[in-house]
């Protein structure tokens, strides 16, 4: 019998006659030498970060599912480069001594585990040290509680700090962790600007200018990677951080540039103008209208004293509260509340008149002007042709007015609303029937209530930045940040010039940057860039029509970076079927089409692909929301939008997901196909079948020689026993 390796609890099992480490209980048969896997039932981490020092407390509950009393080792891989200053361990509440092993000794242990367990998962950590603790006894069918506290210095580059936390993750369909939670209390000595987690979706709550909490909670948790957090401090109005990824110096690199205002105490309070344009047609009757009224009341209560505002309701015709923008005063707010209370849902939908009325005020606006546009329908009065309506609104809006759209329900024209936000550099939001309008609008309004810098423009001097997403830069608000992902050529020192307006006056900021000539760090930047690129192209297909050139580029990028969504999966399967039919690729070189689940899921994926062309309905709303998430992707979960719709039941009755067979290693995707992991870099070669292959048997002397001579192979080898990958210009194939 083969026992799998547990990343954090390794149980060395030998026969009774060897070292008497296990005493089996009759009538249990004597186990064979090997490794048991303890089930990790719960995981809790609490972290206190004080500028550049972190104290991490990890509590884990492991379950021994056997009827045997076991001896084993608890092993905890340390973050790469971590300088652990002190640590303590507790077993079931009793403090116990452990040992701290350097990377060399740890690698020897990892390799020995691979030899005995025939499971290469730990090779991913072969360059890292570890904490090890002997545990005895581990009682049968009982929970083993382990608590670990350690302190270490954070990695730092300039004024950007990074924190890493090892998480239990595997590549072979691990059992989910019943409960998982992480809470970070972050304190800094200077103004805290960027807070960024690329690996998981987290909640970030700022508590003043120098403190924040970061965390997540999950049930049935499965982690695809370790946890990483970046944060940046800066005493000035704006902060910036740059992350480069460039594994090959001969090729263009990838960059992630983040700009943030933080909650800077001395940031100037920028006055804004805002118009609330609300659909009051008959279809908005009932609960929808009441929620819309509540949302408007919330926004009115949170206007700044120096703001100007107006309310416009529209049905068969448009009616404004004021003739134009008016100051925030007690009298005007009282009129506004009465205007909201008197709203009734009746009549048609005259979008043209309402939006043109709101845009008229742009002539008098000498500061940021926002329009919040809420509707649940399509234009039925006035200009009803979407393209003509967009032309009229575009001619009226010179580009200074931001239109933020809220589509309510599923019967709206998503293409119209999305194009409206695109041409005005706004943002789109949808409220499904089961969602609350008030919550969606109020959450959004709090984010835009305090603009810091508007009408942004940027350029980089010293290196060439290209293929940057998003294509247009949004305004920057207090407590918020925005990021740009792109490619670059050249390297070394560069300068970012950022210009914008603060209270109607032009301001220019310059930031020093340094782009790496070659670096293996920050490999997540490549798939995030891939997600934004694919999202942008899918939006072009949605809004402007499909073309072979666009589809081919979506397929290429999605394959390379593992952007597996219901939309891209169908396009990949369709493309591979064509390639196989023309004998351009072998079946073992396909990524999705030859997987049974890929073929069975194809009809469902086709429905999703059809949603790209539909301009209304639930599927169209979902496509708009998911693709916008891809357009602004800044964590790995956003590279697989719509993942829940890729679920299926395998022949054994187990719940699976098509995306589970995709992992990112060294900035590109690896695909599990019929038991073998295949590197997308091989599959995307023009003639992959003609490439020279180095064949190596798993767990052989040559296998460990490859690991020692080419340490970069560890990440690929950790995927499993059967892998084919490209490294240093050569193809390596490991097989049992």
Q: Which residue stretches match the model-derived regions?
A:
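Sec-dependent N-terminal signal peptides
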Residues: 3-13
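Pro/Ser/Thr/Gly-rich intrinsically disordered low-complexity regions
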Residues: 16-46, 88-90, 94-96, 103, ...
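Subset of Sec-pathway N-terminal targeting signals
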Residues: 17-255, 488, 499-501, 545-567, ...
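Active-site-adjacent bridging/hinge elements
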Residues: 35, 118-120, 268, 330-334, ...
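Beta-strand-connecting loop/turn residues
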Residues: 52-54, 129, 159, 210-212, ...
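Exposed acidic/Ser/Thr-rich ligand/metal-binding surfaces
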Residues: 59, 124-131, 135-152, 161-162, ...
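Generic structural signal for alpha-helix starts
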Residues: 79, 304, 413, 652-654
